[in-house]
């Protein structure tokens, strides 16, 4: 528990103090007291997380007996030198994690003078390119065992300095730096190395065959680089426990030598370009394996239905791995402690056995999406953890929607064949439910007014079903951020209670039967709204000026309604549309949980949810999801808007699409329309615009300057023009089809008659003989006459 107050000089009375731990001290933002340097008997000093500012006092160099120093997680902003460290000859443990050392230029020199140093932790310090020091500065202790330089800006120039510790280094962490080029073969000289982490860099080339001592290396993490080639034969690394190679460009197949890695606990080779067949032989001796991720490759799994694995997995991720047989993997029933199971997009076209629904109650994540799994879901696996997710989308499940586990957080049943009435939604009681997606099913009936059962529901997607009736007022009692009800049969008006959903960012009720005017409370009470889609309803009336208060709005679709009146000039208040920058992620609709907490690298798993919106783009309706944050558009088409196009709309320079077609707009196109230089789609057709003599280009008759004419202009009068038009109207695709059919009918009609009817065939060949004889006689006579004449 942190404590507060000030560090008083009364500490000086403790002249024999050897151990001082003030970590997480919540004092005022001041510098480290200089008098600490007078406690010369100190051997342990911990000032981590104390919010100290300024610089590090050089008086700390007086603590010549200090063995351990921790200054991590402070707010130093004026550290220009670390030379005080050179006066600490007994220092063995130094931690300055996430301390701002960007202005420090002598840190390497100071470190090299710590002859007793064993553990060095400088992660997140802003350290950058290192020039190899002169030999005179080389560390003389040769005892440094642990180096943690993750989250810095080191380039590959750091490698030569590391070679000073070939015989002593046990753990090296260079994750999240700027390393480039190939991994040097000299890593093979680090005979004591047990843990090597080069993840999240820009390394390329092949993985060296020699990486440390094969009899000592326990963890190897090369994930998120640009490594190519095949995974080398690791059969000699019999002591390796964790092998992480995801997010590279590795190819080739997985050699059967992996079965020799009997100590392997974690194998992650996901998101590469590997292929080949994986059979039970690959796992023959991997009895300690707990984490297996081979997803997002091109593997084919050939695992027998009767196979009994030698391991008990906690985590299994086989997404996009094709099953040699499209059956549900029966061997999964042998796994009794699995917490994360992902077999999505695996071409499984089978039903699920009853044993599957009795999985151990420790499951946190289940993903069966993107298969062809059929059958009714009697119940979902019981889940204990309060942060858990089930994704069974894009399958062939049918029947009524199954009851929910009480502690589920995310449930995605979209893209199935669930039907029945919507009344059973009231039977769901999920205190922790945050995300519910049952879109693209055949659910019907009126939505029950029982949404108070979910206290934390933030995302609700009921799109593309057959729901009817009015939108329940109790939806407004949810902390909802995204509400998708498009393409149903909802009627009535938007419930006024939705004005209480002040955190709403995504509202899509398009393609329904809603009527009434657009309520003013949308602009007044929903300031966070980013997507507003009311397309294809029965909405009428004019636009309220309060709509212009939606400064975060990026997508506004009011098309195919009966809205009238003028387009408000205040649309220029849409600040997000007036910016020419976008965000890749509109919402942070993901949740995290600790995945694989038992390994040396426990990490959090993000379970994202992508909001989908349908946008009419260049005449075609398109689906946008992952890139939705980059789209900015206004669609007012097919309404009854009148008056002029306001010039203020041209201030929305971030617009990519503007559709005002099929209205009653008049006047001229604003001269400043050219300011919309990011615009990719502009449709002003089917209006009554006038005074636009400067418009040119297809399909208008006026050609733009420098525009090439598609066909030559030939002035032969209206008669010739009509003939050419008539010819084009005759020679159509139907003309060519008729010609082909006629040729085939005539050709085979004659040939079949000659082949099948003997008298006709004999008569035909007799005719050919007579014609041939006649031609021969005529040729002989003509030649004879020609000879007489000569």
Locate the predicted segments by residue.
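Plant-biased, solvent-exposed loop and capping regions
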Residues: 1-790
């Amino acid at each position: 528990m942190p404590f507060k107050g000030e560090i008083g000089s009364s500490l000086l009375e403790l002249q024999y103090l050897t151990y001082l731990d003030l970590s997480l001290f919540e004092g005022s933002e001041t510098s480290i007291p200089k008098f600490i340097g007078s406690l010369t008997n100190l051997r342990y000093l911990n000032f981590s997380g104390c919010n100290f500012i300024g610089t590090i006092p050089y008086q700390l160099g007086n603590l010549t007996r200090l063995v351990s120093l921790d200054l991590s997680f402070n707010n130093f902003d004026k550290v220009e030198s670390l030379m005080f460290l050179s006066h600490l000859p007994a220092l063995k443990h130094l931690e300055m994690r996430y301390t701002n050392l960007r202005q420090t230029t002598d840190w390497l020199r100071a470190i090299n003078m710590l002859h007793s140093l064993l553990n060095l932790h400088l992660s997140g310090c802003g350290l950058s390119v290192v020039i190899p020091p002169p030999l005179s500065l080389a560390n003389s202790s040769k005892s440094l065992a642990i180096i943690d330089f993750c989250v810095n800006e080191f380039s590959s120039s750091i490698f030569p300095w590391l070679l000073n510790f070939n015989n002593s280094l046990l753990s090296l962490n260079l994750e999240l730096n700027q390393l480039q080029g190939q991994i040097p073969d000299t890593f093979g000289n680090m005979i004591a190395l047990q843990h090597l982490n080069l993840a999240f860099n820009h390394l390329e080339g092949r993985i060296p065959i020699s990486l440390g001592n094969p009899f000592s290396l326990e963890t190897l993490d090369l994930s998120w680089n640009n490594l190519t080639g095949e995974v080398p034969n690791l059969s000699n690394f019999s002591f390796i426990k964790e092998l992480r190679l995801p997010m590279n460009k590795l190819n080739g197949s997985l050699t059967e030598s992996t079965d020799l890695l009997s100590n392997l606990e974690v194998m992650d080779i996901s998101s590469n370009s590997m292929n080949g067949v994986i059979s039970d032989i690959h796992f023959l001796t991997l009895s300690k394996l707990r984490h297996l991720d081979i997803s997002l490759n091109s593997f084919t799994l050939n695992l027998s239905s009767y196979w009994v694995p030698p391991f008990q997995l906690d985590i299994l991720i086989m997404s996009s791995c094709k099953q040699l047989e499209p059956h549900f993997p029966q061997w999964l029933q042998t796994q009794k402690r699995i917490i994360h199971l992902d077999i999505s997009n695996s071409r499984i076209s089978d039903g699920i056995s009853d044993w599957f629904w009795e999985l151990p109650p420790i499951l946190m994540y289940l993903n069966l999406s993107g298969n062809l799994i059929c059958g009714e879901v009697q119940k979902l696996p019981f889940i204990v953890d309060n942060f858990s997710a089930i994704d069974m989308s894009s399958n062939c499940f049918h029947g009524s929607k199954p009851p929910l586990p009480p502690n589920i957080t995310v449930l995605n049943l979209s893209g199935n064949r669930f039907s029945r009435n919507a009344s059973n939604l009231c039977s769901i009681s999920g205190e922790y439910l945050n995300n519910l997606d049952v879109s693209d099913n055949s659910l019907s009936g009126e939505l029950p007014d029982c949404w108070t059962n979910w206290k934390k529901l933030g995302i609700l997607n009921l799109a593309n079903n057959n729901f009817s009736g009015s939108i329940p007022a109790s939806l407004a009692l949810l902390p909802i951020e995204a509400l998708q009800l498009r393409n149903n049969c909802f009627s009535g008006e938007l419930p006024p209670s939705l004005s209480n959903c002040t955190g709403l960012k995504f509202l899509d009720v398009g393609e329904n039967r809603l009527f009434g005017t657009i309520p003013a409370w949308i602009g007044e009470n929903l300031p966070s709204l980013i997507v507003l889609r009311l397309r294809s309803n029965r909405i009428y009336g004019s636009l309220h000026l309060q709509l212009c208060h939606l400064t975060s709005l990026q997508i506004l679709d009011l098309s195919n309604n009966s809205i009238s009146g003028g387009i408000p000039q205040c649309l220029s208040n849409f600040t997000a549309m007036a910016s020419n920058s976008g965000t890749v992620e509109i919402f942070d609709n993901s949740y995290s949980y600790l995945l694989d907490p038992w390994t040396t690298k426990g990490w959090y798993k993000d379970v994202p949810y992508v909001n989908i919106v349908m946008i009419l783009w260049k005449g075609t309706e398109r689906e946008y999801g992952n890139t939705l944050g980059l789209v900015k558009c206004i669609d007012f088409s097919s309404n009854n808007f009148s008056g002029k196009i306001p010039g203020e709309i041209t201030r929305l320079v971030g617009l990519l699409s503007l559709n005002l077609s099929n209205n009653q707009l008049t006047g001229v196109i604003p001269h400043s329309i050219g300011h919309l230089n990011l615009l990719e789609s502009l449709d002003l057709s089917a209006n009554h615009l006038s005074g636009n003599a400067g418009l040119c280009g297809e399909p208008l008759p006026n050609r733009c300057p420098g525009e090439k004419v598609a066909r030559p202009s030939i002035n032969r009068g209206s008669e010739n023009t009509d003939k050419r038009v008539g010819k084009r109207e005759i020679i159509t695709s139907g003309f060519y089809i008729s010609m082909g059919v006629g040729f085939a009918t005539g050709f085979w009609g004659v040939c079949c008659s000659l082949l099948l009817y003997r008298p006709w065939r004999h008569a035909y060949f007799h005719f050919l003989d007579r014609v041939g004889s006649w031609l021969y006689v005529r040729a002989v006579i003509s030649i004879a006459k020609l000879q007489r004449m000569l």
